[in-house]
Amino acid sequence: MNSDIVTRRYTSGDYAKSNPDWDAGDSPWKAERVHALLDVHGLRPASIVEIGCGAGGVLVSLRKYYPSADFTGFDIAEGLPSRWEKFRESGVNFVLGDYLESPGPASDLVLVLDVLEHLGNPFDFLDHLRSRCDYAVFHFPLDLSCVSVLREKPLLHVRRKVGHLHFFTRGLALALLQECGFEIIEARYTGAAYTAPNRSLLARFASLFRRGCHALFGDTGVRLLGGETLMVLARPVKTQ
């Protein structure tokens, strides 16, 4: 397992101190959106792996949609096994380790939800991931917007509190995946600005403007005011 300065943020417990709930409140919301994306394309994977599964809530919530599938969550944070204990009877397996270094066959579907922005080298990660999945679902927070760049404080906040090292727009997120050998099947906004749980009163108020701006100006509206996230269904490009 890599022990670089970025990885140590998670293995040392620093991340857990700043984010003790591991964003568990968002898990059912994310699972619903993963299922909706897979369902529209008729995908029913028999094996599902989540890299960076955190407290495990996404996989546990997703299992009701695919009761016969094999579910495995991987994470490198040493404090997480105690949180996984409550899901012992859930039918989801959890592994403390790196999926890309683990033995075994490739998974039908790999979930990479809110992970790439934390990695020191997302290019290397994606290059290795291509041989370990048939399909992948990615979730990107779209931190970059005209407002966030002008204010800068929101970008510094997510860097310090939750460890975002890379910042994305829709176009930048898709470019990264394509440059690393993934074919984009569908990319959709999640409506996070006005549907995600655990939003503050200020965030709910701002969502009114964001929703209107997005409705009027599409992608440009998202780049102006921000507040959105992007979910992407992709698969590795087959080499000849």
Task: Label the predicted regions.
Residues 119-120, 133:
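Helix-to-beta-strand junctions that scaffold the AdoMet/dcAdoMet cofactor pocket
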Residues 1-106, 113, 123-128, 162-171, ...:
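Conserved N-terminal segment of class I S-adenosyl-L-methionine
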Residues 111-118:
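Short catalytic micro-motifs in class I SAM-dependent methyltransferases
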Residues 120, 146-147, 195:
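Glycine/Thr-rich phosphate-binding loops of Rossmann-like dinucleotide-binding domains
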Residues 128-132, 139:
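Conserved helix-to-beta-strand junction in the class I
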Residues 139-164:
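Short, glycine-/aromatic-enriched active-site segment of Class I SAM-dependent methyltransferases
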Residues 172-188:
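A SAM-dependent methyltransferase catalytic signature shared across enzymes that methylate proteins
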